[in-house]
Amino acid sequence: MLDENEKLVSLPVSHRDHRTDGYLEKAASIVGLERLHFDTGAQLLEINSIFQLLAIVDNTPDELVRAKYLQLMPDLIMHALTGEIGTEYTIATTTGLYDTQENQWAYGLAKDLGIPMHFFGEVEDAGSIRGVLSEDIQAKTGLGPLRCIATTSHDTASAVVATPLESPGSAYISSGTWSLMGVEIDSPITNEITLHERLTNEGGFDRSIRLLRNITGLWIIQEVRRDLKSQGIEINYVDLVAAAKAQSDPWRTLFFVDAPVFVYAGGMIARIQQYARETGQPVPETPGEIAQATFASLALQYAHTADVLAECSGLAMPAIHIVGGGAQNEHLSQMTADVSNKEVITGPIEATAIGNAIVQAITTGAIADIGSARALISSSDMKFGTYQPTTDSSAREQIKAVRNRYEELIAHQRVTD
C-alpha cells in the first residue's frame, strides 16, 4: 500500500507469512464460505489478498488509515518504473475481492468484512499502456521514454497465453512451485462443486476466464531437497527424479498435496512421514521413496482436478498441456498421462516470459491476436514433449485401484481442511 505521497506504508510481506493463519475461518464466520466464493468466484486460500487485508485490519489498522493506493506486486513494480498508479485485471482477480461476474471490486463483501475500499482503483485490461519509463529510470539506465505495458501480470495468466491449446477444451498445468491447473472459459462458473473442490475463476487475456485450481506443486520437492541438504545429503533434481523412478512400488505412499501442513517452509520430510503414519501408510524413509510419494500424489491430484474441471465446464478435455519448469520432469509427465488417461503435451518451459512478451507484441501490433501467437509457438523450434497413457490392461487396473484409494484418502479434505 502507498500513502498520499506514493511511498510505501510498510514493506510487502510474503504470501506464505503466518499472519493470515485462521483468517479464512474468521471471514467465513462473518459472511459464510459460500459468499466468499460466490461473490468473487475465487478459491478460498489464506494466502489471498482478502485475508492479508483482514490481518492488517486486526493487527496494524493504522496502515489502512495512511494508505491511499493499493498496488498489487506487479502494479507496484510498474509504479517504480513509471510513477503511474494502476491495477491490472488478471492480478486483481486473484485477490478474493474482485467480482468476476460483474467485473468490478466486490464492495459489498469488503464492507461486511470491515475492509476499507478507498484505496482500490479502477481496473484496466491486460495489454494497457500504463505509461513510459520515468525520467529517473531513463537517466539511470540510459534508455529513452519506452512505453510500459501492463501485461497479463499474474504469472499464470501469462503462461496460459503461451500455452498452445490446439485441441478445444484441453487443460493446462503451469507447473512450478505451484501447479495451477485449469481450462479457458468465457464466463465464470460458481457452484457447490467449485466451492468444495477449491476452484477459482481468474482473469485471462482479453477478459477471458481461467477456471482453475491452485495445487501445491514442486514447492514440496524443493523443500524435500532443502531438508536433505540440511541432513548433509546433497542430491540434484535429476538424481532425485531418477531415485523416485527406480522405486518398485510407485504408489506405496500417497498424500494430499494441498493439506495446509505442506504450505509452509521447513521440516517437509517429517510432515510427509507424519501424514503417512496418521493415514496408516508405509512411512517413506529414503530420498527416492519420499520423492516418489510426492510425484505420485501430484499426478493423482492432477487427475482428480482434471475430472472436476471437466464436470464443471462440460469440456471434453482431450489433452493436458504442462508448461513451466515442471514440464522438464518427464517422470511426472508420464505418471500424469497414465493416471489421467489423457495425452500430456509439455512445453514451452519459459511460458510465463513468452506469454508476457506476446501480450506486449499484440498491444504494439507485432502479432495479430492470441491465436496467431499460439500457432507461432507451435510451429517454433521450442522443445515440446508428448506422453501417451499406458494401454497395458494390468497397469490400467492397478491405476484404477490407486485412484480409488486416493479418492478415499482425500474425500474428507474440502475447503477449510
Predicted regions mapped to residue ranges:
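Short beta-strand-loop/turn "lid" adjacent to the catalytic site in phosphate-handling enzymes
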Residues: 1-15, 43-47, 78-99, 122-125
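Active-site core segments that coordinate phosphate-bearing ligands/cofactors
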Residues: 28-46, 50-84, 97-107, 111-112, ...
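Short alpha-helix plus adjacent loop in nuclease-associated cores
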Residues: 13-30, 358
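Short beta-strand to alpha-helix junction loop
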Residues: 101-102, 126-130
